[in-house]
From Swiss-Prot:
Name by which UniProt lists this protein: Small ribosomal subunit protein uS10
Molecular functions per Gene Ontology: structural constituent of ribosome; tRNA binding
InterPro entries for this protein: Ribosomal_uS10, Ribosomal_uS10_CS, Ribosomal_uS10_dom, Ribosomal_uS10_dom_sf
Keyword line: Ribonucleoprotein, Ribosomal protein
Family statement drawn from the similarity comment of this UniProt entry: Belongs to the universal ribosomal protein uS10 family.
GO cellular component: ribonucleoprotein complex; ribosome
NCBIfam families: PRK00596.1, rpsJ_bact
Top-level division of the source organism's lineage: Bacteria
Job of this protein: Involved in the binding of tRNA to the ribosomes.
Assembly mode: Part of the 30S ribosomal subunit.
Taxonomic lineage from the root: Bacteria, Pseudomonadati, Thermodesulfobacteriota, Desulfuromonadia, Desulfuromonadales
GO terms (BP aspect): translation
Length: 102
């Protein structure tokens, strides 16, 4: 597994949950002897929705909602076989989307 790197990209709506998951991954990787670059915060995507408050009239009365998607990027530079096994066994929170590229 030498001269490879594992790129982990995490997405979540809750930034606190995302940071907890990132810390778990970093601790696991460092415990097994791998070097970690990051976490690098990527730009937050903000989706805004504008809806009418009433069902019939009054177009001027609207309500605005927004959904923020927070993202982080981790690079595990020198992974060992123990690192890969530990990352496979790691149980992260349900609200975090994880993408792993080798």
């Amino acid at each position: 597994m030498q001269s490879q790197k594992i790129r982990i990209r995490l997405k979540a709506y809750d930034h606190k949950l995302l940071d907890l998951s990132v810390n778990e991954i970093v601790d696991t990787a460092k415990r097994t002897g791998a070097r970690v670059a990051g976490p690098i915060p990527l730009p937050t995507i903000i989706n805004k929705y504008c809806v009418l408050r009433g069902p019939h009239v009054d177009k001027k009365s609207r309500e605005q909602f927004e959904m923020r998607t927070h993202k982080r990027l981790l690079d595990i530079v020198e992974p060992t076989q123990q690192t890969v096994d530990a990352l496979m066994k790691l149980d992260l929170s349900a609200g975090v989307d994880v993408e792993i590229k080798l």
